[in-house]
């Protein structure tokens, strides 16, 4: 059985003021071409369909067109919600969609959605587990423990997922595939991207051994492709580059071919980007020596003297200039006020860190930077309702 593993489409995303519609469509067209060529039995999309919980009308239309073209290929489509999605909105019309072989699981009501497919080796059971927090699991599973005094105790993410997996009643004698959108870790720290939502102190970490009962775990949430402890537990990464930290990633579609129980192979189909992502550090003269281009560019200038109209000059070469920063030879930044245009190019957490540095004359600690990101995330989540 051949499966395509995708995640983190983030339809409607805006990066440093640049709308990514054309970049997304360019990549989606490649995915559709691969589907027609490879004819997978199922396409799995592991969460973060949209970039916002309340997507724009255009974002909904873009996803509708992509989903329609996927469905026209005849493949079965399996979709879950991610932390960026509105679970309830993603559930809309899911019953009707099942009749078109599109299975969407947005909300968690105490059990994962189960879809069973067959091939020459028998059944393959898919468990669709949308993004959850421990409170979601605790509030929907009434039989967490037989000890009443412990029922009010808070669950860690690992404990919550253990309970959720136990509720799935997975048959270990059959082939089982989990689709999930969580932060799953092995020993150490996963490779993360600047475009991801970050939690404080790894509170959302889930130990990968929770999923050992599955033959393959199709994960979404982390934006760089990577396996977690073993090849069968995998993040496919975003199909589109969304930050400079992903500039060197080879984006791809993960292809999983299931054989008989215990046998599978994994390969990747490359996805090319509409724009290159260019990170440059050097003098203005060096930066201006390139030919005019449409790369998404981050320029860090090391010039010692003050430069007038630097952004206007750089934009004559870099049409899609995302940010300009200044750095002294020793790696520090010169003490100068930012222009309004400079501030507009900063993410909210970067703007706060810059403000803190200028007022307090010291860098914001890593711990406090993570805390500020979480506060900003909570603020936007509350606004999005």
Please report, for each region that a protein language model flagged, where it lies by residue.
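N-terminal active-site segment of His-dependent metallophosphoesterases
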Residues: 1-68, 72, 373-378, 382-383
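Active-site neighborhood of phospho(di)ester-bond hydrolases with catalytic His/Asp-centered motifs
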Residues: 6-7, 43-48, 76-83, 103-108, ...
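Active-site neighborhood of divalent metal-dependent phosphoester/pyrophosphate hydrolases
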Residues: 8-12, 40-58, 75-88, 184-202
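Metal-dependent catalytic neighborhoods of phosphoester/phosphodiester hydrolases
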Residues: 14-17, 47-66, 81-101, 106, ...
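Accessory, non-catalytic peripheral segments of nucleic-acid enzymes
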Residues: 37, 42, 258-385
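Conserved catalytic scaffold of divalent metal-dependent phosphoesterases
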Residues: 92, 96, 100-199
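Binuclear metal-dependent phosphoesterase catalytic core
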Residues: 112-120, 124, 129, 233-296
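Conserved beta-sheet core of the metallophosphoesterase superfamily
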Residues: 184-264
